[in-house]
Regions:
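Hydrophobic, aromatic-rich transmembrane alpha-helices
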Residues: 141, 234-237, 311-350, 356, ...
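Signature aromatic-anchored transmembrane alpha helix within multi-pass, membrane-resident enzymes
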Residues: 11-22, 159, 205-213, 229-234, ...
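Hydrophobic/aromatic-rich transmembrane helices and adjacent perimembrane loops
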Residues: 171, 176-180, 185, 218, ...
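Transmembrane alpha-helix segments characteristic
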Residues: 16, 21-22, 156, 161, ...
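Membrane-embedded, lumen/periplasm-facing catalytic core of multi-pass transferases
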Residues: 33, 409-468, 472, 505-511
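Membrane-interface helix-loop-helix junctions at transmembrane boundaries of multi-pass membrane enzymes
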Residues: 147, 198-205, 239-250, 333-357, ...
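Transmembrane-helix signature of polytopic, membrane-embedded enzymes
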Residues: 107-123, 136-163, 181-182, 202, ...
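Perimembrane helix-loop-helix junctions
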Residues: 5, 195-197, 227-258, 263
Length: 592
């Protein structure tokens, strides 16, 4: 009885320590080390979610020129105040909308920034939502890995996830990846139950079809995850018995899930694929260029093949980083050669591998960048499961070492070393925070207060703004913004389209147009608008002496020249090393 009480006390003590650690790291990354949302995709989804919370449906204040082109080509009515959102998958947006509605974010005035505010309050709400999904995913993966292996391996993986700086950076970005991780983990858990049932000669139908339900939700979180489902579908075709029955059921479930968005896109824009298809032009600058064109972008097969090859090589060379930095996750590939005693463990690893291969193919086609906040990154969904297999392999090797027979910490030395290596970046991060804690005023060229406090005051709610960071203008300033095109010709076409409903009120330019780029890259990305992009910077550092000359540029002068420009009135929004400015069609008046 005493031994049992001691075990219960020890178990309670360990759980209490784990809970305290979890809460502490949660607070660290959502309060003390949080400086605002760091991904434009996360910011974009948040602004769409606010429109949903307001009862405006799936509409966006961030207008892509290619979306206007789709509406024109299909003879759809264009209302710049009600542009349908056809780029993002809807589920994460709907989740954000529910959260924003609960905190009263549908009313912009409820959460306006003050002069001394460093962080937009709603940014933190979005980050907390993402972090909550991350904690949920940790719990699901604990249940899954403890069922595949044991509680010790599951606990190790859970701690590795908690200590992963990469995972926490994703939560701070506002990306849908944490919701995706939760749904994928739930789908994988049910897929494992189906494999278990079949290996035990029971019927796998119910858990297999339930896994299809979660894969459907996953597809509604990010269209790229359809590639993962293709891998699972192929596995189901050849493994589950009776062959083909479960696979057909899975396909039917997926079709039901994606039918709604496809019908929505078709009815709203005349194209079932929406604007999301144009992401196939490649990650980063290529896809951005396609989105900023009024005319349909040319589809280059040779370019697609070249980008796919380049992206595949990038994935191979950066697989550890893409797997969330979870130590031992890449060891999963060594597990493919290990003869596991339980057939279910051996079979399930092939399911993971097939899904991962097809996910990699999809990422190769649509492209990845080396950025840690790449929105098309799907590798991290597999990281906990792969890490579980990796820890299991290390544990098997360790069991053959004499030290493993020792009791206490010495017998678990391999686990301690793994956790120490994983926690090192987190400990370093905490040390840096304690030495120099300073909230950033700008994240990748987005100065929240200049938009929320200043641009909002010099514009009206019905104004249409052309901007180089329209996602940020939509979220922080609560204004409709069109992504600035690369050519002056496209700009005039957009003006002509806008004249029919809501004329363009002004142009917002920030350091986003050149920040982090060398001048050649910046010139390529901005083309005719390059002079306009650099004008605030040159104006600030030359005290306007050279600005007068550059404004004579044939692409810039008709827009902002004080005498002949269509947007001659200027308001400076931010200065120092990242200046931004707003050029208005009418005389600027600051509202209270």
């Amino acid at each position: 009885m005493n031994a049992k009480s001691a075990n219960d006390s020890g178990s309670f003590f360990r759980r209490a320590i784990f809970a305290a650690l979890l809460i502490s790291i949660f607070i660290l990354h959502t309060v003390f080390s949080f400086d605002g949302l760091t991904s434009r995709t996360g910011i974009d989804q948040a602004q769409v979610a606010r429109e949903v919370a307001r009862g405006n449906g799936l509409t966006t204040q961030f207008v892509r020129p290619v979306a206007l082109q789709q509406l024109v080509e299909n003879e759809k009515e264009i209302n710049l105040q009600q542009i349908p959102e056809t780029y993002h998958s809807p589920l994460n947006i709907l989740v954000y909308a529910g959260v924003l509605k609960m905190v009263g974010a549908d009313n912009f005035e409820n959460h306006k920034m003050e002069v001394n505010d460093k962080i937009y309050k709603l940014d933190r709400i979005i980050a907390i939502t993402c972090a909550t999904f991350f904690l949920t995913a940790i719990g699901i993966n604990y249940l899954l890995i403890s069922r595949i292996f044991d509680a010790k391996i599951a606990s190790t993986v859970a701690l590795i996830m908690i200590f992963s700086e990469y995972m926490w950076k994703i939560t701070q970005a506002g990306l849908p990846q944490m919701l995706m991780l939760t749904l994928f983990s739930a789908a994988a858990y049910l897929a494992w139950r189906a494999v278990e049932a079949q290996e035990a000669e029971r019927k796998p139908l119910v858990p297999a079809l339930l896994s299809g339900f979660f894969f459907g939700l996953l597809a509604l979180s990010h269209w790229m995850t359809l590639w993962i489902f293709i891998g699972y579908f192929i596995f189901a075709c050849f493994y589950f018995r009776p062959r083909g029955v479960i696979a057909v059921g899975l396909a039917a479930i997926m079709l039901l899930f994606i039918a709604g968005p496809v019908i929505f896109n078709w009815t709203q824009t005349g194209e079932a694929k929406g604007t999301a298809f144009h992401a196939i032009h490649g990650a980063g600058g290529a896809a951005d260029s396609a989105m900023r064109q009024v005319d349909s972008p040319d589809f280059n097969v040779k370019g697609l093949l070249a980008r796919t090859a380049q992206s595949t090589l990038l994935q191979i060379s950066n697989v550890h980083n893409y797997l969330g930095g979870l130590i031992l996750a890449p060891a999963f590939f060594l597990c493919l050669a290990h003869p596991f005693k339980r057939s279910s463990i051996a079979i399930f690893r092939w399911n993971i591998l097939i899904m991962w291969i097809f996910a990699s193919i999809g990422m190769g086609i649509y492209g990845l960048t080396e950025s840690q906040l790449e929105p098309n990154q799907l590798h991290l969904l597999f990281a906990p499961l792969m890490c579980g297999y990796g820890v299991a392999l290390i544990s098997i090797i360790w069991s053959r070492c004499p030290l493993s027979q020792q009791s206490g910490a010495l017998g678990n030395l391999h686990i301690a070393i793994i956790l120490l290596i994983t926690a090192a970046p987190l400990l370093l991060h905490i040390k840096q925070l304690s030495e120099n804690r300073r909230a950033l005023t700008s994240i990748d060229g987005v100065h929240a207060y200049s938009l929320n406090g200043l641009l909002n005051k010099v514009t009206d709610p019905e104004d249409i703004i052309v901007s180089d960071q329209p996602w940020a203008v939509a979220w922080y300033a609560d204004r409709h913004a069109i992504w600035i095109p690369q050519s002056y010709g496209d700009f005039t076409k957009i003006e002509a389209i806008a004249e029919k409903s809501s004329p363009i009120a002004g142009i917002h330019i920030s350091s986003m147009s050149y920040r982090g780029d060398d001048i050649r890259t910046s010139l390529y990305r901005n083309r005719d608008m390059a002079a306009l992009a650099y004008l605030p910077w040159i104006t600030y550092f030359t005290r306007n002496e050279a600005a007068a000359n550059i404004s004579q540029n044939p692409s810039v002068a008709p827009l902002i020249d004080p005498q002949v420009g269509r947007y001659p009135h200027r308001a400076s929004l931010s200065g120092l090393f990242e200046p931004s400015a707003y050029y208005s069609r009418t005389k600027i008046r600051v509202k209270n």
